[in-house]
């Protein structure tokens, strides 16, 4: 951070003025889409809603756009994204502040077959996932949640109790002749 500040100070005309102009344009022209929660340009529309040429049957629900980008970069999911804009918390964020109602609308409107809840393994993330599951109970949509447990390359001795508990609870059967 110090190096960045020094670089900006030493190259004020070259870097700071164009950066300030760009930030002002972003502030003026980029907002949050009311339907999916992604970034929306006043000039081009929503990246998620406008550019979808495929007809998907799944929606992956994430807390913020950084979560969407991580999942997209993994190339593991093909479908729509829905960005909540946070999680339900006991201090601050309320369920009304999140885009849960628009998720239910999208599920009904777009004939979504599965909603994948990709919220954090925190108390707030799990509370939010439970609330979404409850909000979708009157639809015919399958609601799933990402598995939790041991991270790839993780050492057992360095894991916290919650991760170990989740790993034991969500363990897989390795016998091929049974479920």
What is each stretch, according to the model?
Residues 13, 26, 39-42, 93, ...:
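Conserved phosphate/pyrophosphate-binding and hydrolysis machinery centered on Walker-type P-loop NTPases
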Residues 2-6, 17, 21, 34, ...:
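Solvent-exposed alpha-helical segments within well-ordered globular domains of core cellular machineries
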Residues 2-68, 173:
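Cys/His-rich Zn2+-binding cysteine-cluster or related metal-binding knuckle/ribbon modules and their
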Residues 51-119:
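Extended interfacial segments that mediate partner engagement and assembly in macromolecular machines
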Residues 27, 56, 80, 130-131:
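Sequence-level detector for tyrosine residue identity
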Residues 11, 77-78, 104-179:
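Long C-terminal interaction/binding lobes of large macromolecular proteins
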Residues 9, 19-22, 57, 89, ...:
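Residues at structural and domain junctions
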Residues 48, 93, 154-156:
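Short, solvent-exposed polar/charged micro-motifs at secondary-structure junctions
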């Amino acid at each position: 951070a110090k190096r960045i500040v020094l670089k900006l100070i030493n190259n004020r005309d070259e870097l700071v003025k164009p950066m300030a102009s760009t930030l002002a344009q972003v502030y003026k022209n980029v907002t949050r889409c009311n339907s999916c929660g992604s970034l929306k340009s006043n000039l081009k529309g929503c990246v998620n809603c406008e550019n979808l040429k495929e007809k998907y049957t799944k929606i992956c629900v994430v807390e913020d756009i950084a979560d969407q980008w991580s999942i997209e970069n993994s190339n593991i999911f093909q479908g729509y994204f829905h960005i909540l804009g946070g999680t339900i918390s006991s201090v601050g964020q309320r369920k009304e502040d999140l885009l849960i109602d628009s998720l239910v609308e999208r599920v009904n409107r777009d004939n979504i077959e599965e909603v994948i809840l990709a919220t954090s393994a925190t108390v707030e993330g799990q509370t939010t996932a439970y609330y979404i599951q409850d909000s979708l109970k009157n639809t015919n949509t399958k609601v799933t949640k990402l598995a939790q447990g041991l991270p790839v390359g993780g050492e057992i001795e360095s894991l916290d109790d919650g991760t170990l508990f989740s790993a034991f609870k969500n363990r897989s059967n390795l016998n091929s002749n049974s479920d």
